[in-house]
Amino acid sequence: EKVEMLHSKTNMSSEGVPRLGIQDIKYTDGPFGIREENGDGFRPLGWKLDSATYFPTGSALAATWSKEMAYKNGWAMGKEGRLRGKDVILGPAINIQRLPVGGRTYEYLSEDPVLAARLSVEYTKGSQEAGTAVCLKHYALNNQETNRGSVNVIADERTMREIYLKPFEAAVKEGGAMCVMPAYNKVNGYYCSENAHLNNEILRGEWGFK
């Protein structure tokens, strides 16, 4: 039963434990809208009387420099997610904008770690107070799409903490983020999903993530 809970049941759900009354966890891959799953992918459902909201990209949201707007954006996403029966939004995407030509740079909030941190906190609070958990992504140092599954990002401790980890730290410690998604890349030689320094020492040990 524990193993079943730790991997996908479908493309966007994890197995529950019916014997204990634990329901499946249903995800939606934001971060700009609540998508509906169709079998193994995201083909059109063909619904005639339904549509989804397309929310602003991270860059557009950050351009407001408004904590209030970030909260409202998160709250609206969370509210729509709850109405559609979702438990977790796979977002916000809060990596630092490092490369202007990066394939997903538009998803991220800013090149400014303080701005990204402040807005991440408010978005997180808004969504979770509306009833849908966030899943912060991509932890950590996922700042390019080229070879994102294999690139080894080399960074010293001060650089990581002052720039790249700051939004994640704030969203966990101040926003109370319920989920964190590991990045595909390596950091200093270890894949993020099995990086003891990032996950055990910093995320759990220092920031108190549970």
Predicted regions and their residues:
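Glycoside hydrolase catalytic-domain context in secreted enzymes
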Residues: 1-210
